[in-house]
């Protein structure tokens, strides 16, 4: 893990030296993506306190990735923002799965927020890729609500299951367009 992080930090340093602005930004984005993924994968495997710190690092790298993606031009910029929003949503989702009570609810809320942004961006893409990205976002939203419903009780649980079903039905409608 340490060697991978070191390698990707070197990749980031080299990317910052590139003269072509768009290429520079894209390569920095790629390095931030790899760093975020390293911390994310380690956070999933780690124990509670260590896991929390690793998730924070994963979020930090993905927020930087999102900032960089907003500077990229055209469809590539939108696609990179979608990718960053997805990973941010996953970071919060995985933390929510490990948490309990109000902390879990807040983390699920953060996950939903990022997956909604992912969906909003996916709607800006045309063609089958845009539809596929919307399907991915609807799946992630449905999964968030489903897992929240599993942790909730009574009426709150029923409402969350309803929202999960709604997103998965939308996912199915989109899939029929492919």
Locate each region found by the language model.
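Short coil/turn connectors between adjacent alpha-helices in alpha-solenoid helical repeat scaffolds
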Residues: 1-5, 20, 40-58, 93-111, ...
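Conserved alpha-helical positions within TPR/SEL1-like repeat arrays
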Residues: 26-41, 79-94, 132-147
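Tetratricopeptide repeat
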Residues: 4, 8-11, 58-65, 111-118, ...
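Short coil/turn linker motifs that delimit alpha-helical repeat modules in TPR/alpha-solenoid proteins
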Residues: 19-20, 24, 47, 54, ...
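Intrinsically disordered, low-complexity regulatory regions of eukaryotic regulatory proteins
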Residues: 25, 78, 98, 103, ...
């Amino acid at each position: 893990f340490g060697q991978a992080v070191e390698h990707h930090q070197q990749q980031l340093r080299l990317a910052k030296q590139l003269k072509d602005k768009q290429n520079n930004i894209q390569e920095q984005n790629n390095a931030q993506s790899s760093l975020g993924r390293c911390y994310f994968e380690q956070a999933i495997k780690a124990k509670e306190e260590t896991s929390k710190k690793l998730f924070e690092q994963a979020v930090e790298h993905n927020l930087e990735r999102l900032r960089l993606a907003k500077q990229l031009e055209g469809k590539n910029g939108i696609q990179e923002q979608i990718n960053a929003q997805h990973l941010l949503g996953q970071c919060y989702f995985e933390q929510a799965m490990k948490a309990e009570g109000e902390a879990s609810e807040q983390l699920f809320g953060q996950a939903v927020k990022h997956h909604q942004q992912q969906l909003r961006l996916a709607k800006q893409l045309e063609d089958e890729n845009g539809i596929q990205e919307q399907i991915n976002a609807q799946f992630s939203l449905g999964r968030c609500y489903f897992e929240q419903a599993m942790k909730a009780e009574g009426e709150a649980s029923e409402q969350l299951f309803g929202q999960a079903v709604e997103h998965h039905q939308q996912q199915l409608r989109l899939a029929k367009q492919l």
